[in-house]
Each structure stands twice: as C-alpha cells, then as structure tokens.
C-alpha cells in the first residue's frame, strides 16, 4: 500500500514537472506528455519487477510455476499446448510456453518479472498515449490504475494466455 502511495506521489510530481515545461506548440506539448508517460511507465515497471514473491495473491504461485517449468520437457509443453488449443482441454497453455522460451535466455524469475513488466507497461503506456491529450489526463489514468489495485495485473494477466 505504501508503495502505491509513493508511485502516486511520484506520478503527481512528474505531472507537475512535465506540465511546467515549455509547451508553446502542440508538438512540444505532445513531447512533454510522451516523456511523462515514459517516466511513469518506468516507475510502474520497477514497482512490478522489483516486488517480492510474497507480494500479491498469485506472485508466489507464478514463481513456483516458473521453477516447475524449468524441469518440464519441451515435449510436455507442446503436448499441453496442443491439448488446450487443438483439443480444447485445459487452460493457459501459452503461459508455460512463454516461460519455457524465456528460460532459454535466463532462468532468473526476477528477470522474467522485469520482462513481463516491460511488455505490459509499454503496451499500457502506448494505450494511454493514444487515448489522452493532456498530462492531466495521463495522471488521472495512472491514478485510477493504481487506486483500483490493477498493479497486480501485470503478472496475473499474462497467465491467462
């Protein structure tokens, strides 16, 4: 809870800072808004990627699943993928596949969290960028995201693949 408050304070300070920058033309105003979104997304990426595995209801379960996938063969991954998407049996076959592919590059769960956070918040930042016109709109969107506790969604949403 304190972290979310800190994120909101940093987002508010960032909104104040980027709003105070010269924006004599729409292009400059747009650049300031874009830089503010990047600033906030970096904060949200760090919030998500640096959390402890005990934070959130599902993070530890996802950690255990990540460790389990290390011991799972590629054949089992593909059989599970086929049974879910071809035969319609089971669920969430994409998530183990993404984990297994990621583990070709790194077996560190923290790096995986960072990877997921970058993908999620880059997409969220792009969405906010396309749907807002002013820095104040961006702040409201980020505040709603934080206040409604959607900050957990960056990892649990990926598990729905």
Regions found by a protein language model. Give the residues of each.
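Membrane-embedded helix bundles of polyisoprenyl
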Residues: 137-161
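Start-transfer (signal-anchor) and selected internal transmembrane alpha helices
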Residues: 1-44
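Extracytoplasmic loop-helix module adjacent to an early transmembrane segment
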Residues: 34-35, 39-41, 48-76
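Membrane-interface starts of transmembrane alpha-helices
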Residues: 28-39, 104-115, 137
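Hydrophobic membrane-targeting alpha-helices
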Residues: 17-18, 49, 101, 127-131
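Hydrophobic alpha-helical transmembrane segments of multi-pass membrane proteins
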Residues: 46, 50-53, 111-119, 155, ...
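Short hydrophobic/aromatic helix or loop-helix immediately within or flanking a transmembrane segment
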Residues: 60, 64-71, 77-107
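Transmembrane-helix motifs of polytopic, lipid-linked glycan transferases
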Residues: 115-132
């Amino acid at each position: 809870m304190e972290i979310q408050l800190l994120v909101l304070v940093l987002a508010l300070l960032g909104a104040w800072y980027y709003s105070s920058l010269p924006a004599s033309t729409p292009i400059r105003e747009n650049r300031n808004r874009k830089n503010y979104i990047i600033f906030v997304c970096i904060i949200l990426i760090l919030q998500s990627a640096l959390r402890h595995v005990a934070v959130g209801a599902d993070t530890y379960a996802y950690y255990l699943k990540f460790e389990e996938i290390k011991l799972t063969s590629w054949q089992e991954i593909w059989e599970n993928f086929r049974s879910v998407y071809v035969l319609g049996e089971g669920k969430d076959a994409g998530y183990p596949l993404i984990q297994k592919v990621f583990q070709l590059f790194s077996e560190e769960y923290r790096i995986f969290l960072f990877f997921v956070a970058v993908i999620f918040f880059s997409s969220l930042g792009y969405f906010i960028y396309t749907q807002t016109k002013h820095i104040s709109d961006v702040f409201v969107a980020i505040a709603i995201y934080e206040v409604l506790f959607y900050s957990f969604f960056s990892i649990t949403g990926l598990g729905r693949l």
